[in-house]
């Protein structure tokens, strides 16, 4: 039988005739998770108490007492002097109980006109805002590192790939600027989300509002929100913002995972395009020669974890009637895990990329000898007024011939080229150089050195 002795009184317990079962309390306790919200909870409570005092719902002296007490509780939590235990049920209870011990019965006035429903919704939005800003700064740092890499390698020729097959020569700077664009969209998504998250739900109470003369706009102002809720039911029952945040983080992790895949492949002996600093690689416990791209592999693996968090949240919310339901307590583990996983992945991956370098000599040798210049032959023929489909067919036959003869495209003689089409002349050899191929691209946003330099300049100007 569960032991009910020495159980702390819970904030909602007065209506019940017997104590809450201890096993049920332990099962439902969230303090081990939502303890992370103590700063946000105290921040929201200080704003609420200040507003209560200004509105005359409590005296200004009482409001001052509460604010001073809350700041003391925050210091105790930060110093480790106050350690929550599962019997406290949640972080809101921990803080209010300790506040009562410090300032006495006045602590009971803090919750005037407030429910844990709008309280936790406020805490969550404050947490989202802080982590949106945190991850946004990490994305800016990532973009800055990618700009440096693009600048460093803007005149380095490498392969561009489709289907993981060598496709066409490109500027390596163009490759790094592609990632810069992707992480830029991630930052835009978060900035857009921040606008929706920065609306205060405080004052919605349980879900129907309050009969007390609250001033939700003042609470919002104190918490630096941009506005207040327009529907009290929506204010406490909505978790769209949490789902949207985890979705945005899933996109970030997807980009990191794809980038990781390139790092893993390119640093392998089979590719040997990229070298990773020893500071960001690991070895084997049995094979002394190994140098593994473990950081990239871990980032790739953690992506699945964040995807799982997104499905977790969608599944929690899909069948809930309005307004608040206790199921929604379970949004915190996937939210917190996603924020920490995304932030740590961005931080360590950026530092790893900073300490990588391209093997330029190998790339120069491989691109000069490869069949990836075939598209240049097709476009050369198009410029000679041959329809593209015919040019493509002719070029395909030339590629097959080169493979059969063991030749590279630049080493095929003009007489050999002319057996495929009379349109060929000496000018074909000007196009069969990797740098000429890259710099012949004329479209905006292409891989030419000029275009890449323009991309870099625009990105620097936008910082």
Curated annotation (Swiss-Prot):
It holds the Pfam family Lyase_1. One of its GO terms (biological process) is L-arginine biosynthetic process. It catalyses: 2-(N(omega)-L-arginino)succinate = fumarate + L-arginine. Keywords: Amino-acid biosynthesis, Arginine biosynthesis, Cytoplasm, Lyase. CDD domains: Argininosuccinate_lyase. GO terms for cellular component: cytosol. GO terms for molecular function: argininosuccinate lyase activity. SUPFAM superfamilies: L-aspartase-like. Pathway: Amino-acid biosynthesis; L-arginine biosynthesis; L-arginine from L-ornithine and carbamoyl phosphate: step 3/3. Its EC number is 4.3.2.1. It is an enzyme of class 4 (lyase). It is found in: Cytoplasm. Its main location: cytoplasm. Belongs to the lyase 1 family. Argininosuccinate lyase subfamily. HAMAP family: Arg_succ_lyase (MF_00006). This is Argininosuccinate lyase. It comes from Chlorobaculum tepidum (strain ATCC 49652 / DSM 12025 / NBRC 103806 / TLS).
């Amino acid at each position: 039988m569960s032991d009910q002795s020495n159980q702390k009184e819970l904030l909602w317990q007065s209506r019940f005739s017997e104590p809450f079962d201890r096993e049920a309390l332990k099962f439902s306790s969230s303090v081990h998770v939502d303890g992370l919200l103590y700063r946000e909870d105290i921040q929201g409570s200080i704003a609420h108490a200040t507003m209560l005092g200004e509105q005359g719902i409590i005296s200004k002296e009482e409001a001052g007492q509460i604010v001073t007490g809350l700041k003391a509780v925050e210091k105790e939590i930060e110093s480790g002097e106050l350690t929550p235990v599962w019997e406290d049920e949640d972080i809101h209870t921990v803080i209010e109980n300790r506040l009562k011990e410090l300032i006495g019965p006045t602590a009971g006035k803090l919750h005037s006109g407030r429910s844990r429903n709008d309280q936790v919704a406020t805490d969550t939005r404050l947490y989202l805002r802080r982590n949106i800003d945190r991850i946004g700064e990490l994305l800016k740092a990532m973009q800055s590192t990618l700009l440096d890499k693009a600048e460093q390698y803007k005149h380095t020729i490498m392969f561009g790939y489709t289907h993981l097959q060598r496709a066409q020569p490109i500027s390596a700077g163009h490759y790094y600027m592609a990632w810069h664009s992707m992480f830029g969209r991630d930052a835009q998504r978060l900035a857009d989300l921040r606008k929706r998250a920065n609306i205060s739900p405080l004052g919605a109470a349980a879900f129907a509002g309050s009969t007390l003369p609250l001033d939700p706009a003042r609470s919002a102002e104190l918490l630096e929100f941009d506005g207040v809720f327009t529907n009290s039911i929506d204010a406490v029952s909505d978790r769209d913002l949490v789902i949207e945040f985890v979705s945005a983080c899933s996109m970030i992790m997807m980009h990191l995972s794809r980038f990781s895949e390139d790092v893993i492949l390119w640093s392998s002996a089979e590719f040997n395009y990229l070298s990773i600093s020893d500071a960001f690689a690991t070895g084997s416990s049995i094979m002394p020669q190994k140098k593994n791209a473990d950081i990239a592999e871990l980032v790739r693996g953690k992506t699945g974890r964040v995807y799982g968090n997104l499905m977790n949240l969608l599944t929690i919310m899909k069948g809930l009637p309005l307004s608040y339901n206790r199921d929604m307590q379970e949004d915190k583990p996937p939210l917190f895990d996603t924020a920490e996983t995304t932030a740590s992945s961005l931080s360590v991956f950026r530092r790893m990329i900073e300490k990588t370098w391209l093997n330029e000599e190998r790339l120069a040798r491989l691109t000069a000898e490869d069949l990836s210049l075939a598209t240049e032959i097709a476009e050369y023929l198009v410029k000679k007024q041959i329809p593209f489909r015919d040019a493509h067919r002719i070029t395909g036959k030339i590629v097959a011939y080169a493979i059969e003869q063991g030749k590279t495209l630049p080493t095929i003689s003009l007489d050999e080229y002319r057996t495929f089409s009379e349109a060929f002349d000496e000018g074909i050899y000007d196009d069969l150089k990797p740098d000429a191929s890259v710099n012949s691209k004329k479209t905006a946003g292409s891989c030419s050195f000029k275009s890449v330099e323009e991309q870099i300049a625009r990105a620097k100007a936008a910082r």
